[in-house]
Design a protein with these regions (language model features):
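N-terminal lobe of the biotin/lipoate ligase/transferase fold
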Residues: 2-179, 202, 250
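Long, positively charged amphipathic alpha-helical accessory segments at protein N-termini or as interdomain linkers
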Residues: 2-44, 53, 57, 158-164, ...
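Short, ordered beta-strand-loop transition motifs
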Residues: 63-66, 189, 310
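Short loop/edge segments at beta-strand edges and connector loops
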Residues: 101, 188-190
Length: 338
């Protein structure tokens, strides 16, 4: 059984900063007195200025009014836990949200929380991620306040062999969350990439701790390129962002709220009805589901073939070009064949 939740994590955003940010953001059109701020965030009136200065040091523009109070000049695009929790009520993801302004890897933090017994639905967020992990040991970096680095901890009652479906669930949720932000229809490349114009803007990494017959917990890491104005030269031909594609800035907070709502919906659909509705939806929105010529790279070989749907566990089936039959791809890199 899960133990008591971890209350404070080293490096996590102080709850008073979170409360102050939420208070100012939700009352951005009025001046709030120092006395009210002190009462709301649980500090003395003498300490209010210090916390305002801490917020300013994080890049939040707060204007002071002598003998009147403070107001926020422009609501910042920060993934503040209190703002998220209020908008996520009724979902599994509203109660335990750990926020970091800078972290190495949200997946690593979530794995530690899973081992410590943290409850299903725990969310870990980072404004900047310096050592995020992608599949096959690749690095996924998140530029400060430009992307979304989000990991959720789940404890589904499913066998380990069905864990690939969790990645599909996350991919569908992410696609639904960003579809209206893009001028072109996004695609899902099995199992974990979201593309637009064949360039990647989102990656998903699912990791788990399992016993032979049961999955103890899984962490689903989702990284989205949102407001990057350009990509590094070495990946600019294969990667993109919502801003690059749309030509405008996007609210990371609103995208994340939609993402977690959709994730809650798809996750509950999967638990209630099994794999069938997830596979049907994937078939509707992914060009990689069937009939796509692909190049497969696994630790033991490379080959080309044509996709032939998914098995009930979420594994991809590929008819090989070399005549060796149909291969079930549990893991490996999938790319569109030239």
């Amino acid at each position: 059984m899960p133990s008591k939740p971890t209350k404070t994590l080293p490096g996590a955003t102080d709850r008073r900063i979170d409360a102050l940010l939420a208070l100012l953001s939700e009352n951005s059109t009025i001046v709030i007195s120092g006395a009210q701020i002190a009462k709301e965030i649980g500090v003395s009136r003498q300490q209010v200025f210090r916390w305002i200065e801490t917020l300013r040091a994080l890049g939040v523009k707060v204007k002071g009014h002598p003998r009147a109070g403070y107001h926020i000049e422009r609501a910042p695009d920060i993934l503040a836990p209190q703002l998220l929790a209020r908008r996520l009520r009724g979902t599994a993801f509203s109660k335990r949200i750990h926020h970091f302004f800078k972290a190495e890897s949200t997946n690593t933090i979530a794995m530690h929380l899973g081992e410590a017994g943290e409850a299903h639905g725990t969310v870990v967020l980072a404004e900047e991620q310096t050592a995020g992990r992608g599949r096959a040991g690749r690095t996924w970096l998140t530029e400060k306040s430009a992307g979304i680095s989000c990991t959720v901890l789940v404890r589904p009652p499913i066998p380990p062999a069905h864990a690939p479906l969790l990645t599909l669930v996350a991919g569908l949720a992410t696609r639904d969350a960003v579809a209206d932000e893009l001028p072109s229809v996004p695609d899902i490349r099995w199992p974990n990439d979201l593309l637009v114009h064949r360039r990647k803007f989102c990656g998903i990494l699912t990791e788990m701790h399992a016993e032979p017959d049961r999955l103890r917990y899984a962490v689903i890491g989702i990284g989205i390129n949102v407001n990057q104005s350009k990509m590094p030269g070495e990946i600019e031909d294969i990667a993109t962002s919502l801003r690059i594609e749309s030509g405008k800035m996007h609210s990371r907070l609103e995208i994340l709220i939609r993402l977690l709502r959709h994730l809650d919906r798809y996750y509950n659909l999967y638990l209630a009805e099994g794999a069938a509705p997830i596979l049907r939806r994937f078939a509707e929105v992914s060009s990689y589901f069937r009939g796509k010529r692909v190049r497969i790279t696994t630790p033991r070989e490379r080959f080309t073939g044509v996709t032939a749907g998914l098995e009930s566990s979420g594994v991809l089936r590929v008819v090989r070009d070399d005549g060796l039959g149909t291969e079930a791809i549990l893991s490996g890199d999938v790319a569109e064949a030239d």
